[in-house]
Amino acid sequence: MTIRRSYRRLVACALAAGFMAAPATVFASDRAWTSSGNTGIVDDSNQAQVFLDVQRARLAGGVQSATIRYNVTATEGLFAGPTKKLTVRFYKPDVFTFVNARLWYEEIATGAMGTLLFFDSSLFAPNAAIQTQSVSMNLVNDFDFGKKVYWVEVGLFRSTGPNGVLLGDPRIDLLQIDTQ
């Protein structure tokens, strides 16, 4: 009986230790700011030009370009590290489609603005499927939500083909900012 009781206690302690260690592992890998494409804010002048459906944002037919903004909110533990990565999930089926994303900041006290990261889909080949690509940068200063506000500005663009017809089908599915 004593061996069986000791074995049960050992198993219970091992399980408890495993459960206590699991959240630390999960939290360490799940610290990222994310936004679905359909949660962006569209300029008043672009309201009829952008469709926010399912999880994506896309241009309406006949529209050449539009701008969508995504507010970046503080995420505990995310912004403390030198290398920041901006990941963009987008649709670029042809050479007439372009998507770009800029991570901006504005200083609350002075109104000074600047760009921290820039993503340009023209660096990646067209693909009939949605693709996920990233850009990284070593940012000396960490995010400071007490002194600055941050947002990602996404541009969706399509261009005209050789016959003068507007072609392309840019879409944005998601954005993610992560610390590496």
Regions flagged by a language model, labelled:
Residues R58-A80:
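Short beta-strands within extracellular/lumenal beta-sheet-rich domains
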Residues F96-A109:
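Short, surface-exposed beta-strand/strand-loop-strand elements in extracellular ectodomains
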Residues M113-D142:
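Extracellular carbohydrate recognition and processing domains
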Residues A80-P93:
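A short beta-strand element within beta-rich, extracytoplasmic domains
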Residues V140-G164:
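Noncatalytic modules at the cell exterior or secretory-pathway interfaces
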Residues T2-A14:
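Bacterial N-terminal signal peptides that target proteins for export
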Residues F27-Q64:
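Glycan-recognition and processing domains
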